[in-house]
């Protein structure tokens, strides 16, 4: 989720409490830039149920970046991932060269920070860019199993490429959309030990809440229920597995919650 979004401003605690009431015990506020990472860390330090990441979203790659701030956020135990980073070929701006330059700069720094002892998993943003992005990630030398392709909206062929690379895949409310059957088919392909769910809120409200704006972390329950249906599992069985996966991938504490 993106708890730092302006649509949540002033009601962040209310959003977290609503999620807790729905059974969502922990969440990660994903950063889109260096200033946003600092704001996400402040939320995470104020509430033990919230964690954060540190990175630059490709659609923010033409904005000012303070690499020292990203590094400082990354030193906090409340920061559990680098990113989100990657490439977005759906929009023309920022231009492809700028996106690639910032991606390369981030990966280079993550390699260096990992060598310093700040090894963290990496949240990847990929939109219409899987074939272009995978060689870049491979060339970084970072372990494939430390990457998660978040908010996956591509079809089975791209999902197979990501899985062959060795990365994880995370799905949003898009798997509940009747007009996105290819994404549900991708979800069917992903092994249960390499899958996660998310909201990407305030965006992409899942069915049956699709008309609700903004999307909120509490609605991740609907995403998990749809993934359970795709795999023919009881929701509570899959939800326990998803908790285990998030704990294992992000190093989250095990609080015993469903």
Region roles according to the model:
Residues 1-258:
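Mid-domain alpha/beta scaffold segments of enzyme catalytic cores
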């Amino acid at each position: 989720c993106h708890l730092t979004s302006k649509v949540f401003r002033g009601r962040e605690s209310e959003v977290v409490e609503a999620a807790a009431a729905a059974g969502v015990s922990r969440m990660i506020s994903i950063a889109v830039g260096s200033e946003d990472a600092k704001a996400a860390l402040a939320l995470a330090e104020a509430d033990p149920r919230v964690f954060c990441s540190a990175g630059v979203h490709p659609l923010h790659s033409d904005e000012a970046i303070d690499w020292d701030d990203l590094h400082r956020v990354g030193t906090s135990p409340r920061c559990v991932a680098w990113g989100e980073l990657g490439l977005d070929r759906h929009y023309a701006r920022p231009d492809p060269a700028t996106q690639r330059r910032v991606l390369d700069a981030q990966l280079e720094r993550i390699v260096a920070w990992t060598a310093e002892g700040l090894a963290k998993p990496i949240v990847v943003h990929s939109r219409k860019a899987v074939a272009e992005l995978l060689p870049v990630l491979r060339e970084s030398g970072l372990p494939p199993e430390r990457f998660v392709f978040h908010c996956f909206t591509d079809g089975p062929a791209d999902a197979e490429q990501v899985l062959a690379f060795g990365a994880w895949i995370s799905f949003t409310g898009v798997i509940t959309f009747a007009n996105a059957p290819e994404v549900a088919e991708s979800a069917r392909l992903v092994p249960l030990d390499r899958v996660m769910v998310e909201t990407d809120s305030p965006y992409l409200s899942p069915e049956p809440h699709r008309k609700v704006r903004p999307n909120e972390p509490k609605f991740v329950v609907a995403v998990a229920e749809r993934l359970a249906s795709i795999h023919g599992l009881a929701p509570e069985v899959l939800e326990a597995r998803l908790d285990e996966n998030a704990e294992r991938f992000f190093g989250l504490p095990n609080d015993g919650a469903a």
